[in-house]
Design a protein with these regions (language model features):
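Short conserved beta-strand and strand-loop elements enriched in small hydrophobics
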Residues: 47-54
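Contiguous surface segments at macromolecular interaction interfaces
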Residues: 2-45, 58-61, 69-135
Length: 135
């Protein structure tokens, strides 16, 4: 029998620091919001998300592992995620108004930090508008 040749490639997963409104971060940390929604997909493969609670809190409060990333029309993604979206249908469709693509990060292994951290702990001097890569 001839031996099979193959190439094994490790897919490197990046960590993303995501700026999120404090109330939505709280829903994630409480387990009420299982998906984080975005309008576009980053270029890098994301394996972990660090949560920065934006103003007025302005602290890094937790993290989660990304189980999977869903991409599709806003209507398709809502039909899959609505039961654990942690946001209202009106808010969701308002967010995606005029957009043809929706991205949803399914979160698992969510951790709330016992002591919130500063952005400077991650070598970051300014809060990201949306997100930044940490590695």
């Amino acid at each position: 029998m001839p031996s099979k040749k193959y190439y094994e490639r490790e897919i490197l997963m990046s960590t993303m620091l995501l700026s999120i409104k404090p109330e939505f971060v709280e829903y994630i940390l409480e387990g009420k919001k299982k998906y984080e929604f975005r309008k576009s997909k980053p270029k890098e493969n994301i394996g972990r998300i660090i949560f920065y609670a934006s103003s007025p809190q302005k602290q890094v409060v937790g993290e989660a592992t990304v189980e999977t990333i869903l991409e599709g029309s806003p209507k398709e993604i809502w039909s899959i995620t609505k039961s654990v979206a942690g946001i209202t249908k009106n808010f969701y469709f308002s967010y995606y108004e005029g957009k043809h693509m929706a991205v949803a990060y399914k979160l698992k292994e969510v951790i709330r930090y016992d002591h919130p951290k500063a952005l400077s702990d991650y070598g970051v001097s300014q809060a990201p508008q949306s997100f930044i890569y940490l590695d």
